[in-house]
């Protein structure tokens, strides 16, 4: 659980365009903290959810043919 911000860590194995989208429990996209070309390496991005209500959120990382979705819990 986090309040009001969380850090998302991720690794990129091949250079390319990377997008991280954050969705609420209804599937509505509420934020896109990463949307850029990145080189190989380890990265972090912070998401401040102070403008959003408590609840379950999901982040989806997309890079090339790779896609991963993880759950986050915002407790205020």
Residue map of PLM features:
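C-terminal outer-membrane/trafficking sorting elements
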Residues: 2-76
């Amino acid at each position: 659980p986090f309040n009001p911000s969380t850090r998302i860590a991720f690794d990129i194995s091949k250079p390319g365009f990377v997008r991280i989208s954050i969705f609420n429990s209804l599937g509505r996209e509420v934020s896109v903290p990463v949307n850029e070309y990145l080189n190989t390496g380890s990265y972090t991005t912070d998401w401040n959810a102070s403008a959003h209500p408590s609840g379950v959120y999901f982040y989806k990382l997309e890079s090339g043919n790779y896609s991963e979705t993880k759950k986050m819990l915002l407790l205020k």
